[in-house]
């Protein structure tokens, strides 16, 4: 299913609306779209000691039409909430109780994670990045890794059944 494709202007308009609603302007903060972001869908970047906002960064996979408008708005609002809470409190609040209270005030979940299904493009990129598949010889439990140590099979055992492990190199 394909949803609305977002661009920087759409994001800035939504951030401007949030700023007007909560009386904290963020129109001067740059917005960037990153193709490299795979673990997080959004990020609020600020200078460590002064808390001066640097930029909002959003994953290209979030904005490519794979996620519903509600999900995209929730991620953008979450990052705005980081900006709002840090600015009001005058210190980085990460995901503390003040941040969670502001999330509820803004009508979004206060989780540090999301339960969104990974888009097909993002899932494909993540799967491509794995170079090794590790399989337990006893129970068949499988994990994937990007890097492993030379003596991996000698030093480690299966976490479920303590069986020996076999490393399979994935073809690219």
In which residue ranges do the predicted regions lie?
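Active-site recognition of the HExxH zinc-binding catalytic motif
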Residues: 74-86
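Metalloprotease/metallohydrolase-associated module, dominated by Zn2+-dependent proteases
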Residues: 2-70, 87-172
């Amino acid at each position: 299913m394909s949803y609305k494709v977002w661009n920087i202007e759409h994001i800035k308009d939504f951030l401007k609306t949030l700023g007007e609603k909560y009386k904290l302007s963020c129109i001067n903060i740059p917005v960037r779209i990153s193709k490299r972001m795979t673990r997080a869908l959004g990020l609020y970047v600020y200078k460590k000691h002064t808390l001066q906002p640097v930029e909002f960064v959003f994953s290209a996979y979030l904005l490519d039409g794979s996620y519903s408008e509600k999900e995209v708005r929730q991620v953008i609002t979450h990052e705005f909430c980081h900006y709002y809470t840090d600015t009001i409190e005058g210190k980085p609040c990460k995901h503390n109780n003040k941040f969670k209270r502001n999330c509820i005030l803004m009508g979004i979940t206060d989780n540090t994670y999301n339960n969104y299904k990974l888009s097909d493009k993002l899932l494909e990129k993540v799967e491509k990045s794995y170079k090794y598949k590790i399989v337990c010889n006893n129970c068949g439990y499988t994990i994937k890794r990007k890097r492993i140590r030379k003596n991996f099979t000698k030093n480690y055992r299966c976490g479920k059944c303590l069986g020996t492990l076999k490393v399979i190199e994935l073809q690219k």
